[in-house]
Amino acid sequence: MSEPKFKHLLEPLKIGNYVLKNRMCVSNSLPHFLQGPETYPADTVMAHYENKAKSAAIVTCMGINNFSHGKQLPMNLDFGHFPDYDLYDTNSQNYLLQLADSIHFYDSIACMGIFVGPPSAYPLMVPKGQQGKADPFAQTKSLNAPPPAEFDLMKIPAHEDPTYYTEEQFNLIADSYAEQAGILKMLDFDMISIHMCYRANLPAKMFSPITNHRTDKFGGSLENRMRFPLMVLERVRQKVGKNMLIEIQWSADDLEGGYTLEESAAFLNEAKKYIDIVQLRANEVDHAHPIGFELEETPFLKFGEYMKKNVPGLVIGVIGGFHYPATCDKAIAEGKADIIYAARAYISNNDYGQLVLEGRDDDIVPCLRCNKCHGRGANDPFVSVCSVNPCIGLEQKVARMQVPTKGGKRVAIIGGGPVAMRCAMYLQDRGHTPVIYEKGPQLGGAIIHADYAEFKWPLRDFKNFLIHQMDKRGIAVHLNTEATPEMIKAENYDVVIAATGANPMVLPIPGADPEKLFFAQETFAHPEKLGENVVVIGGGEVGVEIGIYLSRKGHKASVLEMRDRLAADSTAIHYYSMLEEAWEAEPNFTGITGARVAAIKDGAVEYIDKDGNTQSVPADSVVMSAGMRPNKDLALSFYGCAKEFYMIGDCKKAATIQQGMRSAYATAMRI
């Protein structure tokens, strides 16, 4: 009998009195829309974690924010990101017990994250410059107070001065950690995960010289700076005893001026007296969720390798970009990690773990690293979505959303973009026979440009996955074939699905000649056709990416945007700041906001600035990136070619990949 394809990743691991069924672990994550106002895990939340437990060895649940002395994160500031479970209410405890039990059903370790309130609530509630001026706990008495005027959702201050905490308060906080851990053990949780990274809460702040400027026994030397975090861990271990696993989420190193990798290892060698696992993370919260501009697939594996060598006897877990099982398996085989944590792998694939168990890694859908799973924007409802998995968070109802089918229908799909290909896969899974008609020489549609920009490698992986699936599944594809209603009608299909996409919009600007303008696809494919000075009209996410790409190709790119900031449509949380870093790193990139383009002239583009003045910027070439117009008329021309007719993707409404994937899935489930 052959061994598992990923034998190292699937090998059991003994930790204390527990045995992990494999090395696949789910880090703390949750589709935020699943949890309502309940102070206990909703049924939808339980269904979500149950699904992960079917294959993962450790399932970490989001997360307890309570403080046992009556303080916790105010409801109006938790953004829906963290569930507001009441650990001290007996009715809520009943549901928490059910959550642990549902994870145990699949022989998985039930783990709960702990985020003790005041150290996080304190900087949220105190205006900048006022931290530490009074009793920190007193600042949180008005739990429903609005945030201060200086408060910026995307720049939550993580730098309050811990100087003014007293030793008595340190003891209260440490006791609160221990008390919560004790209750979770009583509720049958096997493990707790204590957040101690990014200088985001008091234990992490106390260890970092960047935030700890104390001169007493809690500051200064390495021994003093580790005193409080070790106090927390010692209290927790004393409370729960030996028969509960304790993990810390830990930034392996720090920003410039902070602690070193060597100091980090020294702390972990002390902490291993109390903890079983360390989950190694980045030194900054946004970079802990790497995107396409991070060209290294798993940028933090090096920390695992270092700690494996320098902290013997502690189980080393790594996280950050671990998606492909071959990469995970190799990391363990080479002794760089003991266990692998992931969140986005399970978000982008409801059946991720099962695919790994079956060795079907080529059926794993790549993650786009767009981080829309954290929310769409700062001013939107904090709704998690996944760009490639339309079933995210639907575990409890996806079966009843599907229309019963016996299959057997012949379906013509007009268009060969990502939405068309994904719809064809879903249709085949339901027993139908899809046929794709693509007028161009290759599949890919609007995402073909991912082949050219190196930072679009996650999107390129997704495109190549879809094309590979067409070939692997034997789905009929007619390239270089411009379908007509007459052609489709003659084939006598049962269903016709129009996926005709959208075309770039040309704004009614004086001098805007479509024959002389460039658009995204051609710009990415042939940057050599553009002159030295390029003006990009439209500074949304696509326009900014065009500007970055051209800058890296040696052009001088000026991006004009009407709104008050560039890439305002991009993911605000754990994405925007890294995109901003990317364009700020390009000396040939210039972003101009509050700019209304007035005219395109020979060698220049004129615009009205935010003060109403006319300005001019040199332009040898002009790229129009002002949105897309759906090909509705073309799509509608296929109505009447079969008994059933549907429109999916951009031809209905120019939208995101996520919206297109949901459109493809929903339509296929109705046929």
Map each language-model feature to its residues.
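Small-residue-rich anion-binding loops in enzyme active sites
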Residues: 351-367, 481-502
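Rossmann-like dinucleotide/flavin-binding elements
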Residues: 326, 405-436, 478-489, 500-509, ...
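Short beta-alpha connecting loops at secondary-structure transitions
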Residues: 288-293, 448-455, 563-567, 646-653
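Flavin-dependent oxidoreductase catalytic cores
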Residues: 1-414, 418, 423-434, 442, ...
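A conserved short coil-to-beta-strand element within the FAD-binding core of flavoproteins
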Residues: 479-491, 593-604
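Rossmann-like dinucleotide-binding cores of NAD(P)H-dependent redox enzymes
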Residues: 433-472, 524-525, 549-596
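Short phosphate-binding/catalytic loops that engage adenosine nucleotides
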Residues: 57, 108, 189, 432, ...
